[in-house]
Amino acid sequence: MRLSTVLLGSLLGALTQAAPTGQFPGHYQSSPPPLGPSNWERNPVSVFFKVLNTQPDPDYTMLKELVTYDCTYVSLTFDNPTLHSIMPWAGTHTNIGPQAFIDIFTRVGLYWDRGPFTIDYIFGDGGNVTAWGSFTATSRTLGKTVISPWAARARVNEDNRIFYFQWMEDTFTTASSFGSDASNKTYVSNPQGGTTVA
């Protein structure tokens, strides 16, 4: 059994068996939502989990509850003007609070059509929490689809609110979804010699 299964199982509690198909209109099987407002324990890992899962449809009310007003969000890099020119949300958003999450999550959705997003592992040590997984995204400008690993970490205060958030991904891959076929670049990385065109 994977660590994430064990952690999420203890985080969410026991899931009830799906109701018989005849109990619902249309005969669709259903089960209670795993993180409803009345059945989740607020702790650093569960807060982090909820924030990660609001990316496709940012919930400002929830983010105001789970993120401090002066939270700092580091997106992809501390400061990289070239990357920022491709993905304008890249960089350090110091003391912007929940609005940084809304701005970044919304803008990502404007630039990419989001595909599957997985949280493979999530765990914490007190107020320090981390998670990683993968996501698929298709650029809305060129229709290029990429798959990237991601990793995130957060620091959570004693009130179980995030005051520092950092998101990393394979920016070489994700930025390439916006590159035209003619936009090759030559790299000289090997000290033994040679170049790579990508």
UniProtKB/Swiss-Prot annotation:
Localization, UniProt: Cytoplasm, Cytosol
InterPro entries the record matches: NTF2-like_dom_sf (IPR032710)
Coiled-coil intervals, chain numbering: none
GO cellular component, as recorded: cytosol
Record GO biological process: patulin biosynthetic process
Keyword S-adenosyl-L-methionine: no
Residues carrying covalently attached carbohydrate according to the record: N128, N184
Catalytic activity, as annotated: phyllostine = neopatulin
EC number: 1.-.-.-
GO molecular function, one term: oxidoreductase activity
Primary location: cytoplasm
Signal sequence annotation: 1-18
Documented applications: Patulin was originally used as an antibiotic and specifically trialed to be used against the common cold, but it is no longer used for that purpose since it has been shown to induce immunological, neurological and gastrointestinal effects. Genotoxic effects of patulin with dose-dependent increase in DNA strand breaks in brain, liver and kidneys have been detected in mice. However, more recently, it has been proposed that patulin might also have anti-tumor properties.
Keyword Coiled coil: no
Pathway of action: Mycotoxin biosynthesis; patulin biosynthesis
Keywords, in A-Z order: Cytoplasm, Glycoprotein, Oxidoreductase, Signal
SUPFAM superfamilies named in the record: NTF2-like
The family this protein is said to belong to: Belongs to the patF family.
Free-text function comment from the UniProt entry: Part of the gene cluster that mediates the biosynthesis of patulin, an acetate-derived tetraketide mycotoxin produced by several fungal species that shows antimicrobial properties against several bacteria. PatF catalyzes the conversion of phyllostine into neopatulin. The pathway begins with the synthesis of 6-methylsalicylic acid by the polyketide synthase (PKS) patK via condensation of acetate and malonate units. The 6-methylsalicylic acid decarboxylase patG then catalyzes the decarboxylation of 6-methylsalicylic acid to yield m-cresol (also known as 3-methylphenol).
Name of this chain's protein: Patulin synthesis protein F
Source species: Aspergillus clavatus (strain ATCC 1007 / CBS 513.65 / DSM 816 / NCTC 3887 / NRRL 1 / QM 1276 / 107)
Gene that this sequence comes from: patF
